[in-house]
Amino acid sequence: MPSQKSPTKRSPTKRSPTKRSPQKGGKGGKGAKRGGKAGKRRRGVQVKRRRRRRESYGIYIYKVLKQVHPDTGISSRAMSVMNSFVNDVFERIAAEAGRLTTYNRRSTVSSREVQTAVRLLLPGELAKHAVSEGTKAVTKYTTSR
């Protein structure tokens, strides 16, 4: 005689996730289901994981764009290219400033090393403008403190 399983009752300790009413606006929005890893379970209830923040220079690139060309927009792909460019230049300047600090047997990167790194990395007139803008920014920062 084959054994039949009887329907098991749920134990009171395990809870099912609470049912929510559907959101306005149909698909999409904040409450839309996203792919990826599921959250951890705590006492039988699914715990929602916080999404990791993606840092970007996007807002600053946009502010500069609006200062230079107020009526011009930027696509997300162009923004991605600009973000990669800023990251690349930042890494190059930081690496060069670090090397200069090591050559001078110092342990702290100062504004002088950063300025020299900019002069070494950027060509001619671009380096002059970058140095003057950097000096202006450092002066503004020190006077505001």
UniProtKB/Swiss-Prot annotation:
Classification via SUPFAM superfamilies: Histone-fold
Top-level taxon in the UniProt lineage: Eukaryota
Post-translational modification remark: Monoubiquitination of Lys-140 gives a specific tag for epigenetic transcriptional activation and is also prerequisite for histone H3 'Lys-4' and 'Lys-79' methylation. Phosphorylated on SPKK motifs 3 and 4; which may regulate DNA binding. Dephosphorylated during maturation of spermatids to mature sperm and rephosphorylated at fertilization.
Record localization: Nucleus; Chromosome
Region (Disordered): 1-52
Residues spanned by motif SPKK motif 3: 16-19
Residue numbers covered by motif SPKK motif 1: 6-9
Subunit structure: The nucleosome is a histone octamer containing two molecules each of H2A, H2B, H3 and H4 assembled in one H3-H4 heterotetramer and two H2A-H2B heterodimers. The octamer wraps approximately 147 bp of DNA.
Protein name as annotated: Histone H2B.1, sperm
